């Protein structure tokens, strides 16, 4: 049983699908066929040299830097999360410094003394995740004595009336001192800020001494038009552009503000160029701006420019 015949409308096999934007040396001057038929002719023509690699296929096999086929090694956490400290570590150790800030009450002192003093925390097993020291330095136990030793007035309120009545320190029985961990955040003291806030430092655009200084800075390689610019031997491009822009600014200032005595007619430099206003009109397809021509309609380009020329003559006759 024979396979069904393919319609002539379809491109014969083998062929490339449209969308390839590469370079075909043989496709330069071929016209009249579709892309598929042309590529089919090139692929079946024995006189055309072909590469063993297809155009749409990658030229080389992609190289993978990382091998994903092997299993990954087990994750090893950082030593800081496992060990309490690192050998030879010389950085900050919180709760390192001790201070004698108060005494235990008598019953607690006896209990602490019977357990062995400083080795209490090492003998009592602590649950996992337990912080042996509070996150903030605790307040020492209050002492009924001089109110100046209590510090903040809130402590005096907490101790009651006896802290306010007696001013002489009360005699206390000798007992074991309680050790507290005091967190010391050692940092240099902040300098007194005396300067006022300078709002000008937050300006995004720089403060320029010359107006339009950003537009006057030319970039090397710029091929656009620079007025009054001329190539001078031995002068840098940026210096030449700066000098040309200075001359252009001066000429524009004199053009807008001509020098003439009071009562005299304005000089010829005040008027626009004579190439715009001519009696014979301008040629069509002129894309420049022609003053007093925007209100004209139902006229050709030549008649519109002639009418603009007449309006300009009338305006000059009414001006000094």
UniProtKB/Swiss-Prot annotation:
BP-aspect Gene Ontology terms: flagellated sperm motility
Annotated compartments: Cytoplasm, Cytoskeleton, Flagellum axoneme
GO cellular component: axonemal A tubule inner sheath; ciliary basal body; sperm flagellum
InterPro entries attached to this UniProt entry: CIMIP2A (IPR052683), CMI2A-C-like_dom (IPR018902)
Keywords from the named record: Cell projection, Cilium, Cytoplasm, Cytoskeleton, Flagellum
Tissue: Expressed in sperm.
Keyword Cytoplasm applies: yes
Stretch forming the signal peptide: none
Family named by the database record: Belongs to the CIMIP2 family.
PANTHER family linked to this entry: PROTEIN FAM166A
Record function comment: Microtubule inner protein (MIP) part of the dynein-decorated doublet microtubules (DMTs) in flagellum axoneme. Binds to the intra-tubulin interfaces.
Subunit annotation: Microtubule inner protein component of sperm flagellar doublet microtubules.
Protein known as: Ciliary microtubule inner protein 2A
Gene (UniProt): CIMIP2A
